[in-house]
Amino acid sequence: DYNSGLESNANQEWKLVDAGNSTYYLACRPQHSSSDYYLAVNTSGTGLTKTSSKTSATAFGFIKASASEGGGGTEGGGGSTEETPGDHGSFDVSWISNQSKVSDHKEDAHATFIPYASVEQLKADALHYEQPWQQPDETKAEYINLNGTWKFKYVAGTSYGPGSSEFQAKDYNDSGWDDIRVPLSWEMANYGKPVYTNVGYPFSNNPPNANSGMSQYGVTDHNATGFYRRTINIPATWKDKRVFIHFDGVYSAAVVWVNGKYVGYSQSSNTDAEFDITGFVTTGDNQLSVRVYRWCDGSYLEGQDMWHLSGIHRDVYLVATPKVFVSDHYITSSLNNEATSGSMSVKLTVDNRNTVSTTKTLQVSLLDADDNQIATGTQTYSGTSTAEKTVTLSGLSNLRPWSAEDPYLYTVVVSQKDENGAEEMAFSTKYGFRNITKSGNLIYINKKRVYFKGVNTQDTHPEYGRAIDMETMMKDLTMMKKANVNTVRTSHYPRQPKMYAMMDALGFYVMDEADVECHYNQNLSSNSSWITAMDDRTKRMVLRDRNHPSVIFWSLGNECGGGSNFSTTYNTCKNLDSRFVHYEGAGSGTNYSDLGSNMYPTVSSVQGNRSGLNGKPYFICEYAHAMGQAVGNLKEYWDVIENSTGIIGGCIWDWVDQSVYDPARLVNGQKKSDKGFNYWVSGYDYNST
């Protein structure tokens, strides 16, 4: 009670009344009154009012804030986008040699989407709405593209840097730094030396440490570091929104600061890294700083047969959402065998990290390829914590199924409305209805047997290194279609999200492979201290890509041996999604692959396994080795496959030669030799010079 009745001016004293869930009503008792009044947010959400009814009152939560750091805007700086400034502690360099520390303050993985303020704005961005691999329109989407020119400083080692303790400060003078394109592998700008290896690591094999370069690959320095800086401008319209920075891929470890404050840490070079920077930015100009390590402990899981290059090699962008928002969506369907009728469910994750008491209306609409609405449904979220809500659309009929031959896509539109029915967020996802089943040792899609006629692929661009632009992706895929390729194995790591959108639309069957290969040190796959890292990479792949109809198989990695850690990653896949799981290293005595698989078998060996391998559908994950030469024996292999009762297909190694321009010449604009030929170098030739 009010000071046990001792307070003589009770109308100036407030009482906290427990409202549950760590929230409280604020009550006061006016003089000469025997009843309490409560604070309530007014119906427009713009101010406070009083009510004598507790049921009409607003429950308030409390957060810890620093008075010395907080709040309001100053001229040229704008106002903070969150109630309190961010405080994520500090980065510890020992993390790059700790296989159990895979990230810090990084967001959970989720399906790819770009938020808009309304369905109207979503559809007004017509090109991205129809072709999700296209660049979103920043005037319509809650999105800012950060690709382009950044300031850059390269240092051949981790122990020294350009003001390494203060380079991230907002007022640090980087005028003497170079400019660099983002995305780009920095070796292609002649910073350090590109390295091509098949089995061996480009650093001394001493896990989890990845510091000393290997002289046989021309790398004599210690672990290199790239320092990146750029200004980001937060529009005034984002003042009351939640702001995220998103990296599609960075080789191999990245530390992020905003306005001199540490935001977070990430490794796993080919999966998304997203950070909530709401409490770190203000409206107007802000300073983004990123330190990238060429190698880290995670590089032991990135020992693929490829060019080993470094830096921010995929897209970087900002997005803004409401403070409470749909952070993930998982689309599933229950269909008849032909995938022409059934139901669709969309599980929505409502993120309420600030435990605000609120109500949101969530709507899911299904539209055909002509943008005609087929069905719609809603769910209501009401609460103070993160929760999942599922919208199910039943009784769907006359569906046009998706396949590689007829890649028909529907559009799933998700929208969110506030307590007053005002729309505040919307996004869309392309979705195809299809059934994947197994009968005997054969795989069927929509009740039809499929021959998976595939290729392995790598991210290699002659000028940009591992940074593959949209035009190159589309050129590769359209050429594959012309060559009657219907399957892509993303050897040996997930691709950029936009490439899956292309494969959905063009019609490919995808074996989506986790970024896990420890070819030179296969003991890691049975060392339990590496489970966290292996499982994180696998989980992030599945959570990001499971809405894509093109993804038919998950693959746990490549050439890691048959270690028991794969039992964990197999179960992770199965717990998150129902697709079949592949792993070539799983022998006959293991239970962590739904397919029998091997690489480079002879035709006679394939003939001997024509009814299946290890009692499972047989997939030849690599064969007809084609690096630098023509493909041979295809007819002989396919005579056996097409007349088998248990072989489902395979993937040629590999789609395109992994050649790059010589960076030392490229930096001077020289792409051709003195005789006029393109001056491309292969990995083994380059390493020997």
Locate the predicted segments by residue.
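Structural beta-strand segments of beta-rich domains
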Residues: Y24, K241-V243, G342-L348
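Extended acidic/polar, glycine-enriched regions
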Residues: T282-D285, T349-T437
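Accessory beta-strand-rich segments of carbohydrate-active enzymes
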Residues: K151-Y154, G218-D328, R353-N354, F508-Y509
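Extended substrate-binding grooves/exosites of carbohydrate-active enzymes
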Residues: G89-P132, P136, A189, Y300, ...
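Glycine/proline-rich low-complexity spacer/linker segments in large multi-domain proteins
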Residues: V93-P115, W133-D137, V263-G264, T283-A320, ...
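Extended carbohydrate-recognition surfaces in non-catalytic/accessory domains of CAZymes
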Residues: P85-H246, G303-Q304, L309-I312, T689
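Surface beta-strand/loop "capping" patches
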Residues: K323-T355
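Lectin-like carbohydrate-binding module/patch detector with strong preference for beta-trefoil
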Residues: D1-G73, G78-E83
